[in-house]
Amino acid sequence: MKNLTILFKVTTLSLAVALLVGCNDDDDNDTAPPAQRSNQTVNILAFNDFHGNLEPPKRYVEAPNPNDAAQSVRIPVGGVSYFADAIKKLKAENPNNAVVSAGDLISASPLTSSLFLDEPTIEVMNDIQIDFDAVGNHEFDRGTDELRRLKNGGCQQYTSTVPCQINKNFSGAKFDFLAANVAMKNDTSKTIFPAYKVKTYGGI
């Protein structure tokens, strides 16, 4: 995966769902109502390769100076505070949304997160209220048992680092972990996490 966090919005113009009406032998039901349609606009807010970057990295982007178009200014980028604010603003534009991490949310992370087994990143993402994390390769850096602990919570130690150093009641991720292509070694018919989840919008 590219070492770049990307935040983008995909707008689905129309989600149409047909209401299927069952049939039986009762003559009173011969005139069933026609299939109904309902349109919903859904924003998918997706990002990837966050890697526990809670603090802004020492990087800048050049942007036009609002006071002088001929000049530019250096603006610090990244960090979870900016990220959370961006998500909040995008959510406010449309309540029908899904916030999706497309992999490498954790691990290969800076000390502020990795020192605590990336528990701070999980808890911050809980506060931001992301919906799904499609686990990437780096989620498995510390093994499947530790990855499940981050999802389900608890303080069982699976690595050389002691867990729950900050929060003695670490409860795990409140969002779904997804993994369609990672099967269990002892039962290849089962994936380590669900392959998909369904989210409803406006009753659809």
UniProtKB/Swiss-Prot annotation:
GO MF entry, a single one: 5'-nucleotidase activity
InterPro entries from the UniProt entry: 5_nucleotidase/apyrase, Calcineurin-like_PHP_ApaH, Metallo-depent_PP-like
Record Pfam families: Metallophos
Domain of life: Bacteria
CC annotations in GO: outer membrane-bounded periplasmic space
PROSITE patterns named in the record: PROKAR_LIPOPROTEIN (PS51257)
GO biological process terms, semicolon-separated: nucleotide catabolic process
Gene3D superfamilies reported in the protein's UniProt record: 3.60.21.10
Name this protein carries in UniProt: Uncharacterized protein in pqq-V 5'region
Taxonomic lineage: Bacteria, Pseudomonadati, Pseudomonadota, Gammaproteobacteria, Moraxellales
